[in-house]
Amino acid sequence: MAMEQFESVFTAKENAEIAKEFTRLKDTCYLDHAGTTLYADSQIRAVGDCLTGSLFCNPHTSRTTEDLLDQVRFRVLRHFGTHPSEYGLVFTSGTTGALKLVAECFDFGDEGAFVYTRDNHTSVLGMRAVVGTERIVPIGREDLRGGRSTGGGKSSLVVFPAQCNFNGFKYPLGLVEDIQRNGLVGFDGDRFHVCLDAASFVSTNALDLAKHQPSFVCLSFYKIFGFPTGLGALLVHRSAQNLLKKRYYGGGTVKIAMAGRNFHVKRDSLADQFEDGTVPFTSIISLLQGFETLERLVPASGELSSIDRVSRHTFALGRYCFQRLRGLRHANSNSVVKLYHDTEFEDRGSQGGIVNFNVLHEDGSFVGFAEVAYMASVHNVVLRTGCFCNPGACQRLLELTDEDVLKQFNAGHVCGDANDLIGGQPTGSVRVSFGYMSRREDVDRLVEMVEKCYVKKMTANGLTRKQIVSNYKNYDQPKLKMICLFPIKSCGAYKITTSWPLCHKGLKHDREFVIVDENGVAMTQKKLVEMCLIKPKIDIKTNTLILTHPAMENFTLSMEPLSNESQSIKLCQTKVCQDNVQAIDCGDAVANWISIALQTSGLRLLKQSDDEARTLRKSTTEIALSNQAQFLLINQASVRWLADLVPDWDDLSQEPTLESLVDRFRGNLIIDSVKPLEESSWTQLRIGPLEFSVDGPCSRCQMICIDQSSGTRTAEPLRTIAREFKGKMRFGIYLSHVKSLEGSDEKLLHCGSPLQVVAE
């Protein structure tokens, strides 16, 4: 196949039928199938029809349900080319649950060894904490090869993935027979059993257990079908099932258990012994619809099974993506991406449909993965960043020593955070992956996003904060120009040019309300961009909240406090920035108005309970429903500076005004000064008689790419911020009110008041 070409494995008709199943994606480009693939619309409808059309009792009650579960077991085993005489199947909560079960139950006897490859999933590393042996040995991939054992020896266990979830490298499955027959190099006195982590592999590949027969296989079904979640399996070869010594027993797993005497007898079958309590039987039954849907949308063709065709399709997309990204060049001919792979995508037998990379600036320095994730979100591209719960592969491919990893941890980086660059070196990477519903257009969207955001570079070099400040010699005292209030979290601003009172949480009535969906989840413009069109106003005299929207009549809501004991109110729970918040439902009338305005059913408006208090992390300062702090300060001079650096507002017909750009940053206190970015050095300041401490810089996200007057999404100014500050997307500073000047009881902020820097 020629470079950068893609030939579809599926027919035009098959592609069309598949596309009909995923219309809910709309304009979203989904590229995280290694995280979870997507369920088809007809699959979920079929599950619903099955559950509503039949009566499924507890399998401990109904023989019919129990028999159906056995049929599902047969179907799963058939998918993997085996049958109950060869393998027993234990349903678990997922791959992690299956691995934990093996770790807890495997009988190592007298000093057997637990061996694992370093590029295993974290769930395998966690096995070290519970295995019944002290001989725990990590090995490199290159050391995973058969030895010269003659049989017998200590019962030992080796765990490796069929496919690395970091970059899609496939381990040769012939190693299974070699190791189980001949042992491992360097472990002459051990008889090894293989535990295969198949979660990543089976999502898009055929695992033939008639050909390769590891003692244990662990997998999750949502990786294959997208639904149900929370369900996996442990497949145990019949020759190895006596090696699992289970101690705990739950309901349904014993023939007899006596309450007064410590006596019990386990059931005979593997599943009956290991499936404690009632299994998730409705989820298990829904696997039948998963198999049916997959085989209907991707039918077998000739000697190729459904999953074989999926494997060919995802590999072809992965190779096309790999080649396109590798071909990107900056104007100076430097590469735009650094790829983290162990193959060149030559062979489907050694490589799956996963591509892993980091983006590079034209000078060769790294772009942080958090920045790439933000920009992808702006372009409606869903991808995964970080280390993907595979610290070993991450460390090896990013060429980090143990000391480097510990240094990053001591610098504040933890798994799952956005601390993407430390000392200029990446702490993780970007991963894209493909499923049977992925298309060539998805790869093109990804590459277009990378080109648009990182290849089109300005010729001017970015300046450091210190250089910028030193270029401005004239100094005028900054002034408070405007106060912006956001009564409803993530809706439009109520702009004040006179004065406004403070309370113990910040500006009075700031982010006092929140819109939630029918599940009680707080809504933001990231999910529902049209929220910016709701512009609340506050009438202090009547103590009312007035909601405005360009397509709606105004709605007036009383803000008079209600007692939590009142029979007319409904207390609710929602979550804001990982904090559980108690709030009061504002009623059906305003809920209906908001649902119509935002064209989304089931929305509710909640008001933070008057006696509810959130506090800043590592502080006792109280805040309302704001994300991070009491106040966010934005300097108009900094916004002007930033606007001048934006090379092209190619998403808009004309450049935005300064006011509209300031609005994007959603600050509470808008100041103006001569020096752009001077606020970044402040630690204490005073506005009029009120003193504030600086809590730190504001980390920006894709919210600033939303035009607050129209809801239009753009790539700027986030792209320019990321470039100028070397991937650290910070703009504006957080403040907390400390005190008023001695002799002053005033708690009012006045627009026009001078701003005095107390400490830097």
Curated annotation (Swiss-Prot):
Its EC number is 2.8.1.9. Pfam families: Aminotran_5, MOSC, MOSC_N. It is an enzyme of class 2 (transferase). InterPro entries: Aminotrans_V_dom, AMP-binding_CS, MoCF_Sase_C, MoCo_sulfurase, MOCOS_middle, PyrdxlP-dep_Trfase, PyrdxlP-dep_Trfase_major, PyrdxlP-dep_Trfase_small. Keywords: Molybdenum cofactor biosynthesis, Pyridoxal phosphate, Transferase. The active site is at 389. Its cofactor is pyridoxal 5'-phosphate. It catalyses: Mo-molybdopterin + L-cysteine + AH2 = thio-Mo-molybdopterin + L-alanine + A + H2O. Residues 608-758 form the MOSC domain. GO terms for biological process: Mo-molybdopterin cofactor biosynthetic process; molybdopterin cofactor metabolic process. The modification N6-(pyridoxal phosphate)lysine is found at residue 223. The keyword Nuclease does not apply. GO terms for molecular function: lyase activity; molybdenum cofactor sulfurtransferase activity; molybdenum ion binding; pyridoxal phosphate binding. It comes from the Eukaryota. SUPFAM superfamilies: MOSC N-terminal domain-like (SSF141673), PK beta-barrel domain-like (SSF50800), PLP-dependent transferases (SSF53383). Sulfurates the molybdenum cofactor. Sulfation of molybdenum is essential for xanthine dehydrogenase (XDH) and aldehyde oxidase (ADO) enzymes in which molybdenum cofactor is liganded by 1 oxygen and 1 sulfur atom in active form. Belongs to the class-V pyridoxal-phosphate-dependent aminotransferase family. MOCOS subfamily. This is Molybdenum cofactor sulfurase 2. It comes from Culex quinquefasciatus (Southern house mosquito).
